[in-house]
């Protein structure tokens, strides 16, 4: 009888531990409000400013919660010999990247998210990404 109780207790403990482990790995999905595909400024305000800040300096209200400070988006050109790295920015937005300042890739990969907004017109995803990149270019320090 005692052996049976021990087996039951161990099984219950193991099941509880597995259940807890599954919960800690659960991903949280946050709905994204749809913005105009032509407005890089609106997309930036809705999707980027919470971490990167209104002016792109990396000082948004959510920045303190990240493992590493967000990238200062105003110095992208400066850090690329004075030329805005459009192709790199488009690739990061589309596919994500291992960016040291993001720690464990905390920045969302926006390509799939933006693509879901206009399933009937997949071209709009690229238009959105391109317009967001163009807006980031306007934030560059002079």
Language-model segments: residues:
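Electrostatic cytochrome c docking/interface patches
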Residues: 21-43, 81
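Secondary-structure boundary/capping motif
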Residues: 35-39, 132-137
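A structural signal for alpha-helical segments
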Residues: 32-35, 39, 61, 120, ...
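Periplasmic/extracellular electron-transfer cofactor-ligation site
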Residues: 41-68, 94-105, 138-142
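Mature, folded catalytic cores of secreted/periplasmic enzymes
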Residues: 19, 32, 51, 61, ...
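Bacterial N-terminal signal peptides
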Residues: 7-16
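Positively charged n-region of N-terminal signal peptides that target proteins for export
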Residues: 1-5
